[in-house]
Amino acid sequence: MESRHILITGASSGIGLEAAQQLAAAGHRLTLPCRSQARADALGELLAKRQLQDQVSRPLGDLADLASVEQLAATLLEQGMPIDTLVLNAGLQYSGASEPRWSAQGFELTLAVNHLAHQALLQRLLPLLLASPQPRVVVTASEVHDPSTPGGRVGQPAGVGNLEGLRQGPGAAMVDGQTPFNAEKAYKDSKLCNLLMARALAASLAEQQHKMPVLTWSPGLVIPRGSGGFFRYSREHNPLGQTLFTLLARDLLRVSETPARAGALLAELAAGPVAQETGFSYRSNRLVGPGQLRFETREPSAEASNDALAEQLWQLSASLVGLQADQGLNHH
């Protein structure tokens, strides 16, 4: 396996951190944006302890602020090193909160970090991906995007309506512009947006005859033992509920994946062999029995498979983050 230059968002904790360590140990060159200097320093210390710091850069890039995303991309473009794999993995959830939180530009924070910042970064970095001989994009989604799955059925289902919230712009609490704020639905919607964005990207790349696989995946329910990772925001809001949920899911029912195993799946998607050399694909780590998960190619939800909706989302999101819809795509 030859060495790749891999950029991973959300690599300072959880699955992203696990994947980063495994990829660094395998000899890949990594760029791991961190939202603060404190985060970057902590990540540097952790990697140094494991002798993994040599091939890793940790630039500042706060996904909750589009100006910071723009600065990060500008720095990387200036350095000019091709990106072989772009992993859009950061995923914020603040379950249990009754009020929305807002990004620096006034967008609801879950959507801002999980979707808008990722599209902004992706479009700006496309020239560096297209400069790689074998580029790929990997997007971490979630089964909760699909109302027919066990996780997607709990609470309000994902659904972006006609994207009225994006048409309203900053200050809209939900993407559909209709439903009252619900933190869990906001997360599900953001994961649906991840899949729609990936689908729109794959369609545009095909139109421009660029060969680049767009690999989307769902890690399954990953529950770490400790305070880091995906559940850290939810734990602050509902500590007892989270503790009971964790005990049930991880220790009694064994329906959850370990961060190390989920990290290995992500590392494989980022640097392993690809089944197809271009186009959209979706794989899900699905529960087939207690303690047994199977990682397999699946179809995302009907809504996530709507090409017209994907194209609309791409165009609206591009304009919200201050880009032309074809920015980065018309690069030869």
Protein language model features and the residues they cover:
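NAD(P)H-dependent oxidoreductase Rossmann-fold/reductase module
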Residues: M1-D84, G91-Q93, G152, M174-H332
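A short helix-coil junction within the Rossmann-fold of NAD(P)-dependent oxidoreductases
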Residues: E78-G80, A97-S98, R124-P133, S204-E207
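Active-site loop of short-chain dehydrogenase/reductase
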Residues: P82, L129-L166, Q209-P213
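Active-site beta-alpha turn of Rossmann-fold NAD(P)-dependent dehydrogenases/reductases
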Residues: A90, V138-A141, A173
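Helix N-cap/beta-alpha junction loops of NAD(P)-dependent oxidoreductase domains
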Residues: Q93-S98, D146
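Short alpha-helical oligomerization interface
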Residues: G96-A112
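A short, exposed helix-loop element centered on a Lys and neighboring polar residues
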Residues: L122-Q123, R199
